């Protein structure tokens, strides 16, 4: 997948559109050029309906939107959310949603940006949580995983 002509690749993260003020800010975001791409790199929202709202809005405004999940998309337990999914099933549901909207994901071939200068391959990497960043009071990976299990949030 390639782009043509001029334009800019923009990146944004931590939209948290479940908060009304953040929704208002996102509604004001516009591409500068018809060729602009937007990389949405995590924490769009907790609820699938909010993620869909945001990505739909952005695909109407940017030539190409590329999404990478953050912890809020994947690890937030959504009480009352229509999707009601966790883990891999939740991720696959979000990838399917992105495909319906024309949004690229880590599961798609890497797109190539061809603006001014040399071509640039955009690699939306989905990297798992690293337990070498351990909670206070844990000293080994096993202790960190046990702590995570006790809180109901295991990210591996």
What are these regions (language model features)?
Residues 2-10, 110-124, 145:
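Beta-strand-turn-beta hairpins that frame and shape the catalytic cleft
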Residues 35, 102-103, 119:
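Local beta-strand N-terminus motif with an aromatic residue
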Residues 68-70, 108, 125:
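Generic beta-sheet signal
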Residues 77-88:
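Short, flexible/disordered intra-domain loops and linkers
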């Amino acid at each position: 997948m390639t782009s043509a002509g001029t334009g800019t690749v923009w990146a944004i993260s931590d939209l948290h559109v479940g908060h009304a003020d953040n929704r208002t800010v996102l509604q004001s975001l516009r591409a500068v050029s018809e060729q602009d791409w937007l990389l949405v790199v995590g924490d769009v929202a907790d609820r699938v309906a909010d993620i869909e709202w945001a990505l739909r809005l952005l695909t109407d405004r940017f030539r190409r939107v590329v999404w990478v999940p953050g912890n809020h998309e994947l690890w937030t337990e959504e009480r009352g959310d229509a999707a009601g999914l966790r883990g891999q099933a939740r991720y696959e549901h979000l990838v399917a949603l992105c495909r319906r909207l024309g949004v690229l994901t880590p599961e798609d071939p890497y797109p190539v940006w061809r603006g001014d200068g040399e071509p640039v391959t955009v690699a939306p990497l989905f990297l798992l949580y690293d337990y070498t960043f351990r909670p206070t009071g844990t000293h080994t990976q096993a202790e960190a995983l046990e702590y995570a299990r006790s809180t109901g949030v295991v990210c591996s």
